[in-house]
From Swiss-Prot:
Functional description taken from the UniProt entry: Part of the ABC transporter complex LsrABCD involved in autoinducer 2 (AI-2) import. Responsible for energy coupling to the transport system.
CDD domains per the UniProt record, alphabetical: ABC_Carb_Monos_I, ABC_Carb_Monos_II
Location relative to the cell: Cell inner membrane
Topological relation to the membrane, as annotated: Peripheral membrane protein
Top-level EC class as recorded in UniProt: translocase
Catalytic activity as recorded in UniProt: ATP + H2O + (2R,4S)-2-methyl-2,3,3,4-tetrahydroxytetrahydrofuran-[AI-2-binding protein]Side 1 = ADP + phosphate + (2R,4S)-2-methyl-2,3,3,4-tetrahydroxytetrahydrofuranSide 2 + [AI-2-binding protein]Side 1
One cellular component (GO) term of this entry: plasma membrane
Lineage per the UniProt record: Bacteria, Pseudomonadati, Pseudomonadota, Gammaproteobacteria, Enterobacterales
Family matches, as SUPFAM superfamilies: P-loop containing nucleoside triphosphate hydrolases
Domain of life: Bacteria
Record-stated family: Belongs to the ABC transporter superfamily. AI-2 autoinducer porter (TC 3.A.1.2.8) family.
Protein name (record): Autoinducer 2 import ATP-binding protein LsrA
Pfam families documented for this protein: ABC_tran
Length: 511
């Protein structure tokens, strides 16, 4: 963070930036400035225009009008190559790595020969506290480590303007602190950072200034110390919310055939001494009508466990019982038919077909059940139902999923999972990259689902989210669950963190 108001010329100054897509104005005369040695946080609801503005600055797309002043020079438009040459690097919310290449190859990919310094890369790895093997395949990394690799790519390019899009979305508190420490070191060298996030406590910790976007405009901007939390939330929230949003409470009842026949409290999913890649001897029971939280540090084995339950990874030992029937040998499709549905952590690579239409994506799992072929009119009607329930923002049902903002993509993925009529719904980081308003919509929906006696397994790195949502909580530590479920007053951030870090005293007390 900056400690002085003495500043040279701004690193970046965007003036009167306009952008339109398909006749819809997504940016309406944006002014945005970034100075040396400062963190300028950018907030806003889904579809507010944050990603579009950053893509224009990074040269990925061009503005219809307006200018970018960088280093004292004015530019009407940039290309990605030109942006890199000017020291601009965008670290995307969804890391864009080559999974079949090594970590080292990914970091060095596209660098000029003069920048190919192994010693520099090793120094950066050490400074960030990254423990991964440079020769391992990038595809073997979890989301948090892929995020670190993307940041390293930017640092290797001597970036002066670093754009971080939800950089802490999948990081643990300890990893976030380590990242912030490294960012402080970068700021001292004169680097400017645009920090896109929905986590207000983190923004207050790291940012010098805050700008809030709403409906393609800057609704609020100022020094962090001078803006209250109420001011920020009010600026993010639309002045008028659709009355149809309350349909999320009625959504489940409106979907024929989506009512599991289990009484509340009935055991629906039981794991008996499960062992697989990244976890061992995991036992737990998930009951109808409850939200069971699964917490733990990144790398604790939570996602690996979820993918094994859904049949995406090989089970090495133990039994998975769904409705008192073993499903160990069933395929993913057969598990889906029996009501086990999984919402993956990485929506872009695992959850959605980005080139397919929104309507097709929402009904993709039911297409498989009825012979794959889509019924356009029915799919469009289904999408409209979820649009009203989840307040999804889009222009037409035929548009590709990749054209939506990250938060609206997440809502499409949630709708896709709900349309598959789950009896057990496993949600892995369901609010990752989602703004405050949309997050509350998703929370309301998950509670509504559980109220219809669906069993919900909630995996989240956001411990406050776990505390708010879960009826019971298991914590994984180094691939194991070594304590009984937390309940009642024990479901709090402090207790969860102690268990996640292997607090033996807490574990013994809980058993």
């Amino acid at each position: 963070m900056q400690t002085s108001d003495t500043r040279a010329l701004p690193l970046l100054c965007a003036r009167s930036v306009y952008k339109q897509y398909s006749g819809v104005n997504v940016l309406k005369g944006i002014d945005f400035t970034l100075h040396q040695g400062e963190v300028h946080a950018l907030l806003g609801g889904n579809g507010a225009g944050k990603s579009t503005l950053m893509k224009i600055i990074a040269g990925i797309t061009s503005a219809d009008s307006g200018t970018l002043e960088i280093g004292g020079n004015n530019y009407a438009r940039l290309t990605p190559v030109h942006a890199h040459q000017l020291g601009i690097y965008l670290v995307p919310q969804e890391p864009l790595l080559f999974p079949s290449l090594s970590i080292k190859e990914n970091i060095l990919f596209g660098l000029a020969k003069k920048q190919l310094s192994m010693q520099k890369m090793k120094n950066l790895l050490a400074a960030l506290g990254c423990q991964f093997d440079l020769h391992s395949l990038a595809g073997s990394l979890d989301v948090a480590d892929r995020q670190m690799v993307e940041i390293l790519r930017g640092l290797m390019r001597d970036s002066r303007i670093l754009i971080l899009d939800e950089p802490t979305a999948s990081l643990t508190p300890a990893e976030t602190e380590r990242l912030f420490t490294r960012l402080q070191e970068l700021l001292a060298t004169g680097v400017g950072i645009v920090f896109i996030s929905h986590k207000l406590p983190e923004i207050r910790q790291i940012a010098d200034r805050i700008s809030v976007m709403r409906d393609g405009t800057i609704a609020l901007s100022g020094k962090t110390s001078e803006l209250s939390t109420d001011d920020i939330i009010q600026a993010i929230t639309p002045a008028v919310r659709e009355k149809s949003l309350s349909a999320s409470q009625k959504l489940w009842l409106e979907l024929p055939g989506n009512r599991p026949q289990h009484a509340a409290g009935t055991s629906v999913l039981t794991l008996e001494n499960l062992t697989g890649e990244g976890f061992r001897n995991v036992s737990l029971t998930l009951n109808a009508g409850e939200i069971l939280g699964l917490a733990g540090l990144v790398g604790a084995g939570r996602t690996e466990l979820a993918e094994t339950l859904y049949g995406l990874r090989t089970l090495r030992g133990g039994r998975i019982m769904l409705n008192d029937k073993e499903i160990n040998r069933l395929s993913t499709g057969e598990r889906l038919l029996r009501g086990l549905v999984y919402l993956p952590e990485d929506r872009q690579s695992s959850g959605l077909n980005l080139d397919a239409s929104l309507a097709w994506n929402v009904c993709a799992l039911t297409h498989n059940l009825r012979g794959f072929w889509a019924k356009t009119a029915k799919d469009n009607a289904t999408l409209e139902l979820y649009r009203r329930a989840l307040n999804i923002k889009y222009n037409q049902p035929e548009q590709a999923a990749r054209t939506l903002s990250g938060g609206n993509q997440q809502k499409i993925l949630i709708a896709k999972c709900l349309e598959a009529s789950p009896q057990v719904l496993i949600v892995d980081e369901p609010t990752r990259g989602v703004d405050v308003s949309a997050r509350n919509d998703i929370y309301q929906l998950l509670r509504s689902i559980a109220a219809q006696n669906v069993a919900v397994l909630l995996i989240s790195s956001d411990l406050e989210e776990i505390e708010l949502m879960a009826d019971r909580v298991y914590v994984m530590h180094q691939g194991e669950i070594t304590h009984s479920a937390l309940t009642g007053r024990d479901i709090n951030v402090e207790t969860i963190m102690r268990v996640a870090f292997g607090d033996s005293q807490r574990q013994e007390a809980a058993c």
